[in-house]
Amino acid sequence: MHICIPVTEELQDTLGCRFVLYSVYLEGFLLCKVRYKDLHLWNEQIYRVFGNRLPKFPPKYYLAMTKAMTNERRLQLEQYLQQIVSDPVVTSSEIFMEYFKKLQMDTFNMPTVQLILRIYMPDGAAVELDVQTSDSAERVLEAALFKLGVSRELGEYFSLFITHKEAKGPFTVVKRIAGFELPFLTIWNLEDDQFQIEVRKWYMNPSNDAMLMGSTEAIDLLYLQAVQEFQMEWTRPTKDQQQKLQHCLKQQNKLKFLELMKTVEYYGYLHITSCTSDYPECDSEVTIWVGNNEMSCHFYSPGGHAENLRLSIKDLICWNVTLLPKKQEVMSPNHQHLELKFDYQQGSSLKCITIHTEQAFLLSSCLKKMLSERPVHRCKEELEIQVDKATCKSNIRPEQNGVHAKKQALLKDKREYCVVDNISDLDL
């Protein structure tokens, strides 16, 4: 998971005192807005539970802050929150879940109400869940799997995702919803009804399919996703494999279909298209598959040159995701300019490639997931994964989409964001 605070907002309280509101983004999506003093108070509370397990909290300033000091604090808070959300022990605790639930609900002025939330499957079918607006993704996933008949013990192999399907366009996996996020707010804050919440498997090693073969209901989910990958041409079967797979589809032989898919190139990989790269030359198109401990990149340069690059996860030295919003542009998941830059070892030399894709955060999450699935190489999980971003003056506001409810009645006026200068810490 990647935390960033790309924008800040200067406001006044009821007494006329100025303070700074920090907009916290999780993998490119607005998670919450929070004041320094509120985070400081919460840090004191959570410190009583976890002690020195927590990162150091940014110190107070008792003199007026300059613009440079304000930016330094923004970066420090960002680093603090990044370390917090990277600790599964902390993020699964009640004190963490309750606080971030409150932050999200307060940020979007959302009351706790009952509603019917649709959770989709890869074939487009949906289950309807009776949930609350304040239910976490962890809770919603449990409810969805229960309704689908999948045992709770197998829940770790699945997750909720935001996906996007255009009427006559491609299907895209946009992001994984973290366990402490509120799925209704995540989908509610998007701009159109082509976004949806989908339950999908969450592991990068296809051999983990074997862990689900004892559950008929889990096999059904695997089958639906495998069929989707096959029909979307995310995999690359040979002609013989394609004929056999088509026959299995006609016969609705799920186990045989899954068995054959295991032999197909790129089965179980995340497929990313519509990317550009600076390799082998600027503005080269690139198609990416990531999974099974590797990242495969197919480059097509403007001059007609094609090149394939397959990198083992152990060959990657480091990577970082950069969020580059354009000036005077609304900052939203539909208007992101992301790049993923990675360094890799080729022989005795170190090389660097930059890829521009709106799925950069998801790609980064998949790379990290592959590391976590390699217990022999657990030390590589300490690999530095940075998220850089450009601070900008822009508006960030949810747009009405009408996916699950009428939003306008629940929305309040949004204020413009701005970089602050000369604000005393006593006001924060």
From Swiss-Prot:
Q: Which SMART domains match?
A: PX
Please, one GO biological process term? protein transport
Protein name listed in UniProt = Sorting nexin-31
Which keywords has UniProt assigned to this entry? Protein transport, Transport
Q: Which family does it belong to?
A: Belongs to the sorting nexin family.
| Originating organism | Xenopus tropicalis (Western clawed frog)
Q: Where is the PX domain?
A: 1-107
What this chain does, per the record? May be involved in protein trafficking.
Asked if the Swiss-Prot or TrEMBL record annotates the protein with the keyword Repeat, the reply is no
Give the superkingdom in one word: Eukaryota
Source taxonomy: Eukaryota, Metazoa, Chordata, Craniata, Vertebrata
Q: InterPro entries given for it?
A: PH-like_dom_sf, PX_dom, PX_dom_sf, SNX17-31_FERM_F1, SNX17-31_FERM_F2, SNX17/31_FERM
Q: Which PANTHER family match?
A: SORTING NEXIN 17 AND 27, SORTING NEXIN-31
For molecular function, the Gene Ontology terms on record are: phosphatidylinositol binding
The record's section on Pfam families has: PX, SNX17-27-31_F1_FERM, SNX17-31_F2_FERM, SNX17_FERM_C
